[in-house]
């Protein structure tokens, strides 16, 4: 079977190396890309990263990736966002003043303070699969443990975007969104052990199913 070729977008955000290694373990051929030229030639795109909303958006726009990502999603090129790569898909964030990509209507909000609640939400937590038939969740049991690091969480205007949630204190927050060929996780699958590797494999296999058959 032809290897799935994924472009991992390098926009000076953290955690790119771990994401690349995770995707390679999941069976993909991975290339870091620093400019948008040629993105359409890849089988899928991945936008990982740690960090704050405003610097992420500034770097994406400065490198020309903002419009390129929108165009890729419009042409139904498979896309996986991770952590800040999920948040920048939204319209804006309470963390800063930069506009987001606006692909998903809604905004990113800070966790409300609660007695005894630690912010950031950091460490292992369980997934509630609100759409268990999503391609991301093939072979993933309800209440699987995955790894989070974030102080802000996305709130889509249309709840049908949400394919998994998690609980932090009394607050239910988005753990993953998906629609069509767009997928994004607030947690870090590349840091989530065997469950995370399976989720990355599910994305790679989703991309592979869309490739032309050999000899076609």
UniProtKB/Swiss-Prot annotation:
The active site is formed by 83, 188, 190
Tell me where in this chain the Glutamine amidotransferase type-1 domain is found. 5-213
**Which keywords does this Swiss-Prot/TrEMBL entry list?**
Amino-acid biosynthesis, Cytoplasm, Glutamine amidotransferase, Histidine biosynthesis, Hydrolase, Lyase
Please name the InterPro entries in this protein's record.
Class_I_gatase-like, GATASE, Imidazole-glycPsynth_HisH
Top-rank lineage group of the source organism: Bacteria
Where found, per UniProt? Answer: Cytoplasm
Molecular function terms from GO:
glutaminase activity; imidazoleglycerol-phosphate synthase activity; lyase activity
Q: Which GO terms describe its biological process?
A: L-histidine biosynthetic process
What is its pathway? Amino-acid biosynthesis; L-histidine biosynthesis; L-histidine from 5-phospho-alpha-D-ribose 1-diphosphate: step 5/9
- What CDD domains would the database entry show? GATase1_IGP_Synthase
Quaternary state and partners of this protein? Answer: Heterodimer of HisH and HisF.
Name-wise, this protein is Imidazole glycerol phosphate synthase subunit HisH
**Gene symbol of the encoding locus:** hisH
